[in-house]
Amino acid sequence: MNFYSLLPSRHDVSADNITEKFCQFCLCCNPWYAGADTRQLANAFNMIPKSEGQKFEIWVLFLLVRQYHQKIINSWSKLVGFLGVERKDEQSTQKIQQYVVRLKRWMSQTHVDAFFDYLLNKPNPYYLEIPETQPQVRCNVNVTDDLVIKSLRAGLMSHPDVNSSSISTMRTSTSPSNWIHSASASLDDNTHNLGSFVTNPHADSQECPTPQSLLMRASHHMSERGSQQAHQTTPQNHSLPHPPNMFEPPDEDHQLPSAANNSHNHDHAFQTAEAVGVADSIDPDWHQWPDDLRDVSSPKESDGLNDSWSRQTNQVETENVENEAGVPRKRGRPPGARNKIKRLRSEPSVSLTLSISWYERFEKLMHAQNTMLRSAFSHVARLPMETVSQLLSHYTETISQYLPPSETSPIPKTPNFKFISSTLLALVSSHSEILEASTDRLIWTVHQGPLTATICHAFNLEKAPSMHSLAEAQMIPDVPISHSNSMEPLDTVSSLKLEIAKLNAALKEKNLELENLKRKIMNAVFD
């Protein structure tokens, strides 16, 4: 089962279900908080920063952001103006810009910007690169400032009982594929629970929205196991599938890893999720949370509870570290040493990500993806591999002949040729389909993980042959396309477009001669 199928659908977004989809999106991107109550998360999502006490709707903000990405609105100042933020004559001229800064900070802390990118089919590392463990900083947002994490932690602490039959089903799962499959089996039965809490967050109900509709329901099991084992002595690691890259060869079956290779990682993931339920859900900055997120009657009561739990937790944590290290407890140990041990114990393990330059990756995958490109052509067009190889070889050679020389590079044609070649190679890094192939244009649709793109190669009929025989690839969101799996017209594309370009060049020369002749006649008449 594909991991991206657990993300909410972006095609039926409306004002009634956008909050529900946001909660589902956050739970899917933060699987460590499986079983959390999403009522406070829904409240945080709908709490757009106010301006002079004026409240704004999240659906209106989404529509304006979509128009901003579509270049209908060309600045954030105009966007907040359409949202309803106004500056009076006696107010500062920086009021609009100050609210823009507040709005962007709130969107970053709640990851609403990543959610909007997902709905608008734009890549974002928040949902494309889910880390193995919860990092201290994610998408430039510290965990102490992350409103999504705070809401989910508070939801874990106030979660009611969960059905025991679902827990037994989850514990018997031995592989990530079974883990997600068991969760998706109850997707239809539990989706209405999430929607009911979003639409009516104050309703008295025994059921609450849980990520069993996304991943699994395990809050009750976390609380039971967390009270017995507040901290594990050995840090556990768990793995989640990483999304495919546009320039990396994809898996042939586009499936999650096999159970034999990942059953041990799944056990670690389940144990780590259990430990998050109690001890790790206690935040030292609990008293700094907003009142609507803490949901407590008195700040003093919250502070006292937090202090007592923090002292207990820190004492147990320090003793466990000392016992593991075999260090005898000495009187008069400096407080700095204890703080250092606790700091090292609490620091999360961040996996190293090696960044490879684009050109190095291009050179390494050139041969492999060329083979994949020919295979994709052969499969879609139902042509033999020999015919496809000859066709593409002639096609790319014709392109390289008519590319303009590069002024910055000492080797002409090479950067431009790599640019167009990489565009062609990226088309087969995942499922691709030929939508239209004619003498005018070649249109593809590419499905890359949760993203979908339509790419059009239009043959340029206006410029001379010495400039471009093929225009650059254009991303087209919505175009009327006639579906066709036939590639027979491509056999004559190179010759036809060259003849048409020559005719256009000759026509331009005739028009230029005609204009010069008219100019001479007019000069002779007036002289």
Curated annotation (Swiss-Prot):
Biased composition (Basic residues): 328-343
Compartments, record wording: Nucleus
Effect the entry attributes to changing G332A: Loss of DNA-binding
Protein name in the entry: ARS-binding protein 2
Residues modified as Phosphoserine: S297, S298, S302
Keyword Nucleus: yes
Function: Binds, preferentially, to the Maundrell ARS consensus sequence within ARS3002.
This protein's UniProt keywords: DNA-binding, Nucleus, Phosphoprotein
Gene that produces this protein: abp2
GO CC aspect terms: mitotic spindle pole body; nucleus
Compositionally biased tracts (Basic and acidic residues): 284-303
Organism name: Schizosaccharomyces pombe (strain 972 / ATCC 24843)
Biased composition (Polar residues): 225-239
Ranges annotated as biased composition (Low complexity): 164-177
GO MF term set: DNA replication origin binding
Region (Disordered): 160-184, 219-265, 282-344
InterPro entries found in the cross-reference section: ARS-binding_2 (IPR018562)
